[in-house]
């Protein structure tokens, strides 16, 4: 199995509402989340290790993973909020405003990491996840 390690979040995409008001529509996202979804849809064995909230947005993330054949057994569930990324589109270019302080994805600890990864044949790390995963790898090496 390929284990994707990184962020899962909700992209808040600007769209006009039915009454021509500006609003934001929530879409599951995050670079590593999207990669896991794509791999799962190709019917390859893939899992996601990410901090995911149990709030309504986290439920949306988990539903998308399940519908796309992504193993969620290494998801780190938390009652902390889901990271939100508000997207601003200017001339087709996206910029982001993140709300992620104390979120499920940012508050992962070494103790949250899985201890058995026998079925993992490859890892894919996102940049945001490397800090926590490096701590995990360092601790695992110390145990050997």
Protein language model annotation of sequence segments:
Residues 1, 112-115, 138:
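Short amphipathic alpha-helices and their capping/turn segments at secondary-structure boundaries
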Residues 1-70:
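Glycine-rich phosphate/adenosyl-contacting loop at the front of the ribokinase-like
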Residues 9, 13, 128, 141:
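Anionic group-transfer/hydrolysis microenvironments
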Residues 35, 82, 137:
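Ser/Thr-centric signal marking residues that sit
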Residues 45-128:
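Conserved N-terminal subdomain of the carbohydrate kinase-like
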Residues 130-135:
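Glycine/threonine-rich flexible loop motifs
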Residues 136-144:
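Single conserved hydrophobic/aromatic residue that forms the stacking wall/gate
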């Amino acid at each position: 199995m390929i284990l994707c390690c990184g962020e899962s979040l909700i992209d808040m995409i600007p769209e006009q509402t039915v009454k021509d008001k500006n609003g934001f529509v929530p879409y599951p996202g995050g670079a590593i989340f999207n990669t896991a979804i794509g791999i799962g849809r190709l019917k390859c064995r893939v899992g996601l290790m990410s901090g995911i909230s149990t709030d309504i947005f986290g439920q949306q993330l988990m539903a998308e993973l399940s519908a796309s054949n992504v193993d969620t057994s290494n998801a780190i569930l938390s009652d902390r909020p889901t990271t939100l990324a508000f997207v601003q589109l200017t001339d087709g270019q996206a910029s982001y405003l993140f709300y992620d302080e104390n979120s499920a994805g940012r508050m992962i600890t070494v103790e949250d990491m899985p201890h058995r990864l026998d079925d993992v044949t490859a890892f894919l790390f996102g940049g945001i996840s490397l800090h926590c995963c490096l701590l995990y790898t360092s601790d695992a090496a110390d145990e050997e």
